[in-house]
From Swiss-Prot:
Species in which this protein is naturally found: Schizosaccharomyces pombe (strain 972 / ATCC 24843)
GO cellular component, one term: cytosol
Subunit structure: Monomer.
Catalytic activity: ATP + H2O = ADP + phosphate + H(+)
PANTHER family: ATP-BINDING TRANSPORT PROTEIN-RELATED, ELONGATION FACTOR 3A-RELATED
Region (Disordered), start-end ranges: 1022-1047
EC number(s) given by UniProt: 3.6.4.-
Name of the featured protein: Elongation factor 3
Residue ranges occupied by any ABC transporter domain in the UniProt entry: 411-647, 673-1000
Function description: Ribosome-dependent ATPase that functions in cytoplasmic translation elongation. Required for the ATP-dependent release of deacylated tRNA from the ribosomal E-site during protein biosynthesis. Stimulates the eEF1A-dependent binding of aminoacyl-tRNA to the ribosomal A-site, which has reduced affinity for tRNA as long as the E-site is occupied. Assists translation termination by stimulating the release of nascent protein from the ribosome by release factors.
Source lineage: Eukaryota, Fungi, Dikarya, Ascomycota, Taphrinomycotina
Primary site of residence: cytoplasm
Length: 1047
């Protein structure tokens, strides 16, 4: 039988089935509809058969007979609900959707119900990538129809699309939200209710953690404009950190446009702040382009008319940011790209087809393919696999399969080429056995970290995981090991190696720590001991409680335990933290030799990554992008990531305040801290941790403290800063010297103030002029031994024996100071009736500093601190001053004054700690392992800031990269002894350039009160004195009154 005759038979069969559905009894209706659906979706020889039957269906939809209209709608529902809708049928169903939606307004209830069911069935059966073919007709119905029941159904169709095509529909939110917003003002109560429900559902597609909790308020503002000011206030206190995409702007811009039109100046200012903050997080100019006409005119108008200069400056900042992000030049808003328009994609498809002419009756399928291609372009999907999978089935309806692959490839490349800025990064191919190849999304709490990204790992490969602080590197590794990554193979053994070990196991010996782990299959103690010894553990370390191990040994222990679990993938989070150079080299060698175990490594040590990794997995706009090669190769491909590789490449730079003037210190070489023959031993230990150590620190010091793990570096620093007191030895510290100390546990203090803003925290911490967080230092707390020493010290003054009751003030005495003391006078000393009676304040006496330091050093230090307060070397504790100080360390003013500490990222908290520690303008900054808690950008900024700091710097670090070019002096600590090198210690002032005491501007006490200073009288020259004498003699000769002391 010929194809032509087969075609005639197919058409005739379809016509008979359709006719039977129209005239059959109600009992046969379901079977007739099912028969029609099976035939239409079955194999029909010539593809023009569906076009003819759907043409007949279209005519019958307008039949005068209500039963005929109802039956054909039910037939359409059956076709759409068929188990496998044919690819050449689907486009025709969508083509009929507007006509089906219109029938929802039919006067006959049965027809209306059939139309509702058919329209929903059609929307459900289509591919998710065809939303551009469906959404326009649905929105047109909502916008133009005067029939409330049709509008209700169209709103419900949007609800269906949220269920079946959520990610694809999110790209259409800028078109959907304005139309649904308009229907929320409908006069029909049912429509208003349905509109609000639909708006709530479509807003669930907005993947932005910053505004998630405000979405109900944003929706409420559409129906209740009077709520706009309060919502603006709520949003104004929000820190925006998540990348802003079109869905976010689609719900935010209507509110912001209204905010700009509010009468209140504070609301206009807050609106401009929100626009500025959100715009900074827009990466693609095409994302913001459609919204520029709604925001820029309002901002321009406010700038030209507002009277408040501060508000005007904020508005100008928002305009500058919007114009930069949107590529606005000379006020001209750029055109929105048409690359993702279905009409453009249809033209591209026809051009690609070339000589293969699209049959007139298959134009429907061609348009449908163009809509799918437009969606792929909208998503910037450049993966060939996606285009082949989503387009090929529909082209086979009218194109020979031999040509399809070439046509799809040409359509993809030409369509993607029209995207401004090009497509997203195409991942480089990697050889080897696949361990995993999965697509997933990841969130932390309400914050989205990764969105529909792909992770592909090969066996035996080493990957570096790179991204800024807060991007979710550690969260991803925890999600992998906890089985929370969708699609990740469950049979793979993944082990997360952390640098911290649970405190609950602090008393467990090292060997038992491995033995007691249920995930370790080997229970042979000798084998575990052998493995530990191979990793340099001694017998003492093997049996030592892990709480007594240094950080480096804990890391090696955790890694040894991990290998006993026979892992497929090792997840290492900052493995070089606390490791000295020797152990870092050991770790590099260890990882490189693991041929069957893959590794994912997070590290700030770029040199380590350069030696170890074979590929970099980089966080880019909520995606993971893989780049083959080590760290240096990665930087060549992504120059913007240069700060990961070179600290000096960081664009940020911290600026530390200039230290205050120190009385008697005339050069930067003079020692302001000096330690001689100091030893320290923790109570209960068998030997001292530090032995016979001497050093000095000056304003010009740039010191690196290095040494193996457990050598005593942190203990030395704690003695230096007063956290610990030496067991033996002398420590001199200039009376007014201030030290800023940032320990490894840098966030400890912040955890007690989660609900304060950074500004409020600094105001609380320095409310009395002193640092309240430093009140518990050992150098300030009076111990029982101190009390006993003070109690037993008797001074003989004016023939009486006295004990010091208090030390109140200080004054200059030659090259030192003397202190005013109040006393207890002794009566009947040495007898049973001995007692000590407080003396009157008139009996106070001044004692030299040298006499007091032996027993009353801590009381003397308190007076020194109080005198430093009176000297006016402290700034006013007001918001503006705090904002200016924090801005030097990379914290924005809005963040400092309007964000709570608990909402800050890890990097922002470190900057706050640095800002708080340096508030009192320290003379020495001491940092313990700064590379452990700062990302690469911040480390580069810190390095630059420390280079230019006017005081001394002491660093404890294993990172040679960080100290190179920064430090000149090295303290090598090993086995309790310290060997200095590169030092230039001097006695006295030294021979360096003299420090000139700067003429200070206004100075303030700790409470912000201005300190008035008496102006110094100018000393007259000899010529001026002689001239004055002549004038005085002339006045006396003239009989005028002249004062004897007049000059």
């Amino acid at each position: 039988m010929s194809a032509k005759s087969e075609n005639k038979q197919s058409v005739k069969a379809l016509e008979e089935l359709l006719k039977h559905l129209t005239v059959c009894d109600a009992a046969e209706e379901a079977d007739a509809a099912k028969a029609l659906a099976s035939f239409v979706n079955g194999p029909i020889e010539e593809q023009d058969a569906p076009s003819q039957v759907f043409s007949a269906i279209s005519k019958q939809l307008n039949d005068k007979n209500a039963t005929a209209r109802e039956r054909v709608l039910k037939g359409l529902e059956a076709v759409a609900n068929h188990g496998s809708v044919a690819a050449d049928v689907e486009p025709y169903l969508v083509e009929l959707l507007p006509a089906v939606i219109a029938k929802v307004a039919d006067k006959q209830n049965a027809v209306r119900d059939a139309a509702i069911a058919a329209s929903k069935a059609i929307v459900r059966c289509t591919t998710p990538y065809a939303v551009k073919a469906i959404v326009p007709s649905v929105l047109e119905s909502i916008h133009t129809t005067g029939k409330w029941n049709e509008k209700m159904n169209s709103l419900q169709l949007l609800d269906v699309l949220v269920e079946v095509a959520p990610s694809q529909l999110s790209y259409s939110l800028p078109q959907i939200i304005p139309v649904v917003s308009e229907s929320m003002w409908d006069t029909k109560a049912e429509v208003k209710k349905q509109s609000k429900e639909t708006m709530t559902k479509v807003c669930t597609l907005i993947a932005n953690a910053d505004i998630d909790r405000f979405i109900p308020e944003l929706i409420n503002c559409i129906a209740h404009p009077e709520e706009v000011p309060e919502t603006i206030h709520s949003l104004g206190a929000t820190t925006f950190v998540t990348e802003v995409q079109a869905p976010t702007l689609s719900i935010m811009v209507p509110l912001l446009a209204r905010g700009l039109n509010e009468r209140s100046t504070p609301i206009k200012r807050k609106t401009a702040v929100i626009i500025d903050n959100m715009s900074k997080l827009v990466e693609d100019p095409q994302v913001v382009a459609p919204f520029l006409p709604k925001l820029l005119p309002g901002l321009y108008h406010i700038k030209d008319t507002i009277g408040d200069p501060e508000c005007r400056s904020v508005v100008q900042r928002a305009i500058t940011t919007l114009e930069r992000v949107g590529n606005v030049v000379d006020g001209k808003i750029p055109e929105v790209s048409t690359a993702a328009n279905p009409e453009v994609c249809l033209e591209t498809l026809k051009a690609v087809l070339g000589e293969i002419k699209v049959p007139t009756n298959e134009e429907v399928i061609a348009k449908y393919v163009a809509n799918i291609a437009a969606q792929l372009v909208e998503e910037k999907d450049n993966e060939n696999e996606s285009w082949v999978l989503n387009i090929t089935p529909y082209l086979t309806a009218f194109i020979d399969e031999a040509h399809i692959h070439k046509i799809v490839e040409q359509l993809r490349t030409r369509s993607i080429a029209k995207i401004p800025g090009g497509a997203s990064h195409a991942e480089e191919e990697e050889e080897g056995e696949d361990l995993c190849n999965c697509e997933f999304s990841l969130a932390y709490g309400a914050k989205i970290l990764l969105n529909r990204t792909r992770l592909r790992l090969k066996r035996g490969r080493r990957y570096g995981l790179c991204g800024p602080n807060g991007s979710g590197k550690s969260t991803l590794m925890r999600a992998i090991v906890n089985g929370q990554v969708e699609g990740f193979p469950t049979h793979l053994r993944t082990v997360y190696v952390e640098h911290d070990i649970d405190e609950s196991e602090a008393d467990t010996p090292s060997v038992d720590f491995i033995l007691q782990d249920p995930a370790v299959p080997i229970k042979d103690r000798d084998e575990i001991v052998k493995a530990l010894k191979e990793n340099s553990f001694t017998d003492e370390l093997i049996n030592m409680p892990i709480g007594s191990l240094s950080g480096g040994w804990k890391m090696k222990l955790a890694l040894t335990r991990a290998m006993f679990k026979n892992p497929d993938i090792l997840l290492l989070d900052e493995p070089t933290n606390h490791l000295d150079v020797v152990n870092v080299a050991w770790l590099e060698n260890f990882l490189v030799n693991q041929k069957d175990v893959s590794s994912i490594i997070v590290s700030h040590d770029s040199g380590f990554l350069d030696h170890v990794v074979q590929a970099i997995i980089h966080y880019e706009r909520f995606k993971l992008r893989k780049y083959l090669g080590n760290m240096s190769e990665f930087v060549k491909k992504v120059p913007s990531a240069k700060s990961y590789y070179e600290l000096g490449a960081s664009e940020m730079e911290f600026k530390f305040p200039e230290p205050g003037f120190l009385e008697g210190v005339k050069t930067k070489q003079r020692a302001i801290i000096k330690v001689q023959h100091m030893s320290f031993q923790y109570p209960g230990t068998s030997k001292p941790q530090l032995n016979d150590i001497s050093f000095q620190v000056s304003l010009s010091s740039r010191i690196a403290v290095i040494g193996p793990n457990g050598a005593g570096k942190s203990t030395l620093i704690k003695v230096l800063t007063g956290e610990l007191l030496p067991t033996v030895g002398e420590i001199y510290q200039h009376e007014n010297c201030r030290i800023a100390y940032v320990a490894q546990a840098a966030f400890t203090h912040l955890g007690h103030h989660p609900d304060k803003t950074p500004s409020e925290y600094i105001q609380w911490r320095f409310q009395s002029g002193e640092d309240l967080e430093a009140m518990d230092k050992a150098s300030r707390v009076i111990s029982e031994a101190d009390e006993e020493a003070m109690k037993n010290k008797i001074f003989k003054i004016e023939g009486t024996q006295r004990k010091i009751l208090g030390i109140h003030s200080r004054r200059k005495l030659k090259n030192s100071y003397e202190y005013e003391c109040s006393f207890l006078v002794g009566e009947n000393i040495g007898m049973k009736s001995e007692r000590w009676v407080p003396m009157m304040s008139s009996d106070n006496a001044w004692l030299p500093r040298g006499e007091l330091m032996e027993t009353h050093a801590k009381m003397v230090a308190e007076v020194d601190r109080a005198e430093a307060l009176k000297s006016g070397q402290f700034r006013p504790l007001v918001r503006k001053e705090i904002e200016e100080h924090c801005s030097l360390l990379g914290l924005d003013a809005e963040l400092v004054s309007h964000s709570r500490i608990k909402g800050l990222s890890g990097g922002q908290k470190v900057k706050l700690v640095l800002a708080a520690c340096t508030w009192l303008r320290p003379h020495v900054i001491v940092l313990d392992e700064p590379t452990n808690y700062l990302d690469r950008d911040s480390l580069g900024a810190l390095s630059k800031g420390l280079k230019n700091f006017g005081g001394g710097v002491v660093l404890v670090t294993h990172s040679r990269e960080f100290t190179e070019g920064l430090t000149e002096e090295v303290w090598a600590v090993n086995n309790g002894h310290m060997t200095p090198s590169g030092h230039n210690w001097v006695s006295g002032q030294g021979s360096g350039p003299r420090i000139q005491e700067k003429e200070e501007g206004d100075t303030f006490d700790a409470f912000g009160n201005k300190i008035e200073k008496a102006k110094k009288a100018k000393k007259l020259t000899g010529a001026e004195l002689r001239k004055k004498k002549k004038e005085r003699m002339a006045r006396r000769k003239a009989g005028l009154e002249v004062s004897d002391d007049e000059l």
